Amino acid sequence: MAISDWPEAERPREKLIQKGATVLSDAELLAIFLRTGITGKSAVELARNLLTHFGSLTKLCAANLHEFSKLPGMGPAKFAQLQAVMEMARRALAEELKSGDIMDSPQSVRSYLRLSLGGKPHEVFVGIFLDARHRTIMIEELFRGTLTQASVYPREVVKRALYHNAAAMIFAHNHPSGVAEPSRADEMLTQSLKQALALVDVKVLDHFVIGNNETVSFAERGLI
């Protein structure tokens, strides 16, 4: 049955307008983005198929064009639309992070990092460079690795901190496995970075590990 034949209160777009986006399921939100289904499938059914295929909304949003286009009804146009939506969300969150003390917006930091790093098939290590008032100077990808690890060099991080004239930093990296639990190696690396940056009077405020459905803060766990 086409969505237009559904009771009005059950149609995703009408439900969003009447009750707000937060009440919609992932499939309903995705259906609004897709706008139309394909032969034999409504937009909601197609959205459910996409989520089942990729395993989660995070992994769907992180898929490349080749993976995305394998599914019926998906192609370059829909892929470009999805990437544009994702980039607008990232930029909006980045603007918020640059508007004041980053420590006053912990949820915005988590949201930005999950949107930027969640679901990636390889490990990415990011640095957020801050001034003395903890305002964002720059958000920069520092290292990129493989499915299991990224090689991080404290000396290079110190160079970038000096280049940006940073007074403090926040680090983040993803776990492609989807599990956000920090490893012993993550803890040791964080301490190495903290010690190296202390030599140039740069504080490490936090280190986030990003999984598919969770973000772990070293500071909250007392690991900084």
Curated annotation (Swiss-Prot):
- All residue ranges annotated as the MPN domain in the record: 102-224
Matches recorded under Pfam families? RadC, UPF0758_N
Motif (JAMM motif) positions are: 173-186
> Which GO molecular function, any one, fits this protein according to its record?
metallopeptidase activity
Enumerate the UniProt keywords alphabetically: Hydrolase, Metal-binding, Metalloprotease, Protease, Zinc
- The entry's Zn(2+)-binding residues are 173, 175, 186
Q: Which InterPro entries match?
A: MPN, RadC_JAB, RuvA_2-like, UPF0758, UPF0758_CS, UPF0758_N
Recorded hits in Gene3D superfamilies, A to Z, give: 5' to 3' exonuclease, C-terminal subdomain, Cytidine Deaminase, domain 2
**PANTHER family hit by this protein:** DNA REPAIR PROTEIN RADC, UPF0758 PROTEIN YEES-RELATED
Q: What is this protein called?
A: UPF0758 protein Neut_0782
Species of provenance: Nitrosomonas eutropha (strain DSM 101675 / C91 / Nm57)
Taxonomic placement: Bacteria, Pseudomonadati, Pseudomonadota, Betaproteobacteria, Nitrosomonadales
